[in-house]
Amino acid sequence: MAPAASRLRAEAGLGALPRRALAQYLLFLRLYPVLTKAATSGILSALGNFLAQMIEKKRKKENSRSLDVGGPLRYAVYGFFFTGPLSHFFYFFMEHWIPPEVPLAGLRRLLLDRLVFAPAFLMLFFLIMNFLEGKDASAFAAKMRGGFWPALRMNWRVWTPLQFININYVPLKFRVLFANLAALFWYAYLASLGK
């Protein structure tokens, strides 16, 4: 009886909601890993775009309450259908293709991520956003010419230390979540490129 009573008290106290939310997330992560990572990516990507809009409003000292609702929706679509699933499978592939016991595994994984995955993923981001915004191929080409290299260089600066930690120290099942949390600010940066 005592353990059950103390458990009830613990759940009823401060922090019960975060504990239950975490337990639910871990359950969904175990039962539906790709769907859970997709949903998390969609939500956090949308939140990143919303954050970018709020930062932009503050920077311009705008007092209007209007926001571009389409921005967070586009980012949610991108996060749900692309970021979550692709990241899940990329990390899984990388873990099995370059196992920890391979010499210099951490460095090899980082190089694979930074030199192959990051440029391809960034190009995909520009392509999908161009499509979701209803723009044509010439707009995509202009975005690639004007925004790809600056964004990739910034990606390498910002994400290289984060990905080193993520790839080498974060458990495989949490890597997408770790990247999503860091990406809140990255998506805010990418969204600012679209202005």
Curated annotation (Swiss-Prot):
Keywords: Membrane, Peroxisome, Transmembrane, Transmembrane helix
Principal location: membrane
GO (cellular component) term, any one: cytosol
Classification via InterPro entries: Mpv17_PMP22
Cytoplasmic membrane side: 1-30, 97-114
Organism superkingdom: Eukaryota
Annotated compartments: Peroxisome membrane
A Pfam family per the record: Mpv17_PMP22
Mode of membrane association: Multi-pass membrane protein
Transmembrane residue ranges: 31-51, 76-96, 115-135, 174-194
Ranges of the Peroxisomal topological domain: 52-75, 136-173
PANTHER family: PEROXISOMAL MEMBRANE PROTEIN 2 (PTHR11266:SF80), PEROXISOMAL MEMBRANE PROTEIN 2, PXMP2 MPV17 (PTHR11266)
Record family assignment: Belongs to the peroxisomal membrane protein PXMP2/4 family.
Biological function: Seems to be involved in pore-forming activity and may contribute to the unspecific permeability of the peroxisomal membrane.
Protein name (record): Peroxisomal membrane protein 2
Gene that this sequence comes from: PXMP2
